[in-house]
Amino acid sequence: MLFLQPRLLLLTPLLLVALYFILPDAVINRFASIGNLGDSSTSYRVYIWMGTLAMLKDYWMCGIGPGDAAFNLVYPKYSYSGIVAPHAHNLFLQIVCDAGVVALVVFVLLLFHYFRDLCAAFCREKDPFSRLYQTAAVSGIAGFLVQAMTDYSFYNYRVLFLFWAWLALGSLLARRGQLPERGLRT
């Protein structure tokens, strides 16, 4: 399969440079503004994170309880510049807000085992299609976690369900090589 050739990875930097000339200016400007605190979206999130961290100084052990109602009840006392926010705009901060630092440790350990098991299975796997599926399972969760650094999507139950379903599918793909193959019964 052409797309699984390691030599094609050498083309990645060239493709990234080509994106600069292909993407619309609005997209390029948005990427350029990510680290700029003068950008309203970036400064908004930074202020929310600062307020959330101030709140977690008092509620780090057990959190404030799940849901946006609990967050909206407690957060305004800690918010910077009077910024109103429905959630922490960061998955990891929101987990600590909802259930405390122990929940965050459990979540991070779960993710560690997920990535470790899938990467180990990828190294053992000989079937190129299985390797492709394992790569997709790792990439899907990794991409979600990168996005989760600047937003909290679990308030949407469809996204929450898809996240856990994707984790379950990836875990199954990690253990697929250990399962006995069974033919169709006639």
Model-inferred region functions:
Residues 1, 99-142:
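Hydrophobic transmembrane alpha-helices and their immediate junctions
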Residues 18-27, 111-114, 145, 150, ...:
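Hydrophobic membrane-targeting signal helices
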Residues 36-50, 58, 62-99, 122:
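Long extracytoplasmic/lumenal interhelical loops at the membrane interface
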Residues 27, 32, 113-126, 154, ...:
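Juxtamembrane transmembrane-helix termini
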Residues 1-23:
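Hydrophobic alpha-helical segments of polytopic membrane proteins
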Residues 67, 96-100, 155-163:
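Membrane-interface micro-motifs in multi-pass membrane enzymes
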Residues 9-10, 14, 135-186:
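Transmembrane alpha-helices of multi-pass inner-membrane enzymes
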